[in-house]
Amino acid sequence: MRCLPVFVILLLLIASAPSVDAQPKTKDDIPQASFLDNAKRYLQVLESKRNCCRRQICCGRTK
């Protein structure tokens, strides 16, 4: 009988804990991976532009 109150309290705590499905995804939710992919792609574009201008072949300048 001593364990019954502890068992009931644990059941109440488990039932009130938020689950994974507590917040349904909306169309505005974007996975973290896509943010990282976009950041990598943006950095690659910047790097290619910097290398391009360093070689002066696509910045409108001639050697």
From Swiss-Prot:
Contains 2 disulfide bonds that can be either 'C1-C3, C2-C4' or 'C1-C4, C2-C3', since these disulfide connectivities have been observed for conotoxins with cysteine framework V (for examples, see AC P0DQQ7 and AC P81755). It is found in: Secreted. Residues 1-22 form the signal peptide. Keywords: Cleavage on pair of basic residues, Disulfide bond, Neurotoxin, Secreted, Signal, Toxin. Expressed by the venom duct. Pfam families: Chi-conotoxin (PF16981). One of its GO terms (molecular function) is toxin activity. Residues 23-48 form a propeptide. GO terms for cellular component: extracellular region. Its main location: secreted. InterPro entries: T-conotoxin. Belongs to the conotoxin T superfamily. The cysteine framework is V (CC-CC). This is Conotoxin TeAr193. The lineage of its organism: Eukaryota, Metazoa, Spiralia, Lophotrochozoa, Mollusca.
